[in-house]
């Protein structure tokens, strides 16, 4: 291969690399960004899933539910302090994603709960899941498993910051 062709191919790869590193999904008016989870310990039966959902449309949508072949059940949960104690509860009726707004599912707040894990989540794994929306319908995503101490998505090797 000629050097000029190699340089052109390398430059094209560098330009294309950032979108590949920042994994996410576009589905109609919804942009689902950085789905991630934490590594789980052997024998641990549950794990959390986190992401952002931006609604670029003019109509509200709702995240109704989720499924995954990696878990017996997947639920939408919220965490909040009640009487000085942090409690986790299942959300019924889904979560609104307002027109022009963003819903953030993050540690300590709303999140996806993978229950009855079929095997431990290991760092580097990509956990397949399907999110179900009121308007958009079913959307396939993959949660990138990060180290157990992560507090935010790691993209492109920049750590949990």
Regions found by a protein language model. Give the residues of each.
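Compact, glycine-rich, soluble single-domain proteins
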Residues: 23-126, 130-161
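N-terminal signal peptide c-region/cleavage motif recognized by signal peptidases
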Residues: 16-17
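Bacterial N-terminal signal peptides that target proteins for export
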Residues: 1-9
């Amino acid at each position: 291969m000629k050097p000029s062709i190699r340089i052109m191919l390398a430059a094209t790869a560098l330009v294309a690399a950032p979108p590949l590193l920042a994994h996410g999904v576009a589905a109609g008016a919804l942009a689902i960004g950085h789905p991630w989870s934490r590594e789980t310990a052997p024998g641990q039966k549950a794990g959390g899933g986190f992401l952002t959902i931006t609604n670029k449309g003019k109509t509200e949508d709702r995240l109704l539910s989720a499924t995954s072949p990696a878990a017996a059940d997947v639920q939408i949960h919220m965490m909040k302090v009640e009487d000085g104690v942090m409690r986790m509860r299942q959300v019924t009726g889904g979560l609104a994603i307002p027109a022009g707004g963003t819903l953030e599912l993050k540690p300590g707040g709303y999140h996806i709960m993978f229950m009855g894990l079929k095997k431990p989540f290991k760092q580097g794994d990509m956990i397949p899941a399907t999110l179900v929306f009121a308007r958009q319908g079913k959307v396939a995503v993959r949660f990138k498993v990060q180290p157990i101490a992560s507090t935010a998505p790691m993209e492109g090797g920049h750590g949990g910051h």
